From Swiss-Prot:
Protein family: Belongs to the complex I 20 kDa subunit family.
GO cellular component terms, A-Z: chloroplast thylakoid membrane; respiratory chain complex I
Residues that bind [4Fe-4S] cluster: 43-44, 108, 139
Catalyzed reaction equations: a plastoquinone + NADH + (n+1) H(+)(in) = a plastoquinol + NAD(+) + n H(+)(out); a plastoquinone + NADPH + (n+1) H(+)(in) = a plastoquinol + NADP(+) + n H(+)(out)
InterPro entries documented for this protein: NADH_UbQ_OxRdtase-like_20kDa, NADH_UQ_OxRdtase_20Kd_su
Places the protein is found: Plastid, Chloroplast thylakoid membrane
Quaternary structure note: NDH is composed of at least 16 different subunits, 5 of which are encoded in the nucleus.
UniProt topology in membrane: Peripheral membrane protein
Cofactor(s) demanded: [4Fe-4S] cluster
Protein name from the UniProt record: NAD(P)H-quinone oxidoreductase subunit K, chloroplastic
PANTHER family: NADH DEHYDROGENASE, NADH DEHYDROGENASE [UBIQUINONE] IRON-SULFUR PROTEIN 7, MITOCHONDRIAL
Keyword NADP: yes
GO-annotated biological processes: aerobic respiration; electron transport coupled proton transport; photosynthesis, light reaction
Length: 227
């Protein structure tokens, strides 16, 4: 397993004083104490529960599971996310302090999995709701893969600049808790690739903040969510 590299922490003076920046020091302290909020809804979460045992021992990474989003800086979604779960997941994410990170674990979380073709109540990808930092495919992923995903997230944090992260999040649009999911009628015309199309009301009747958390500088032709 590769170790986390710090580009500025190896510059030592003759007096054995580490020369670094406050940003690198903050990143080092955060990656050594990631406190996850476990959002498990199906079988993928059982694989993550295996990490608690002595065989994998995820405590060595500083991972301390928290039950409150206000004490967590990492949310790990494992399993299917339904339409009814979506507002609560977004609410939990908004209650987490900055900086915060997301790991999407399993095919059902990333794309909807086996429910992505003809299910009327499944969200086809958790990245439609909250920004995802690391995608972990599998059905379900092995505990070794979860450790590898956490290692990659630690490497990402070690090279991160907070201002760049905030700027990149503002480019994308994510739903807030004020957004209401409406179930559309299914369209069965014989093709398995036909999904469910949701068209919100006209934007002239509702303010823009009802739909999106961040405003994008690029114009969008329409506001449609395909699940």
């Amino acid at each position: 397993m590769n170790s986390v590299e710090f580009p500025l922490l190896d510059r030592r003076t003759k007096n054995s004083v580490i020369s670094t920046t406050s940003n690198d020091l903050s990143n080092w302290s955060r990656l050594s104490s990631l406190w996850p909020l476990l959002y498990g809804t199906s079988c993928c979460f059982i694989e993550f529960a295996s990490l608690i045992g002595s065989r994998f021992d995820f405590d060595r990474y500083g991972l301390v599971p928290r039950s409150s989003p206000r004490q967590a800086d990492l949310v790990l979604t494992a399993g299917t996310v339904t339409m009814k779960m979506a507002p609560s997941l977004v609410r939990l994410y908004e209650q987490m302090p900055e900086p915060k990170y997301v790991i999407a674990m399993g095919a059902c979380t990333i794309t909807g999995g086996m429910f992505s073709t003809d299910s009327y109540s499944t969200v086809r990808g958790v990245d439609k709701l909250i920004p995802v930092d690391v995608y972990l495919p599998g059905c379900p992923p092995k505990p070794e893969a979860v450790i590898d995903a956490i290692t990659k997230l630690r490497k990402k944090i070690s090279r991160e600049i907070y201002e760049d992260r905030v700027r990149s999040q503002r480019v994308n649009r994510y739903f807030t808790t004020n957004h209401k999911f409406l179930i559309g009628r299914s369209i069965h015309i014989g093709n398995s690739d036909k999904g469910f199309l949701y068209q919100p009301p006209a934007t002239s009747k509702l303010p823009a903040e009802k739909f999106f958390k961040y405003k994008s500088s690029a114009p969008s032709p329409s506001h449609e969510l395909v699940n």
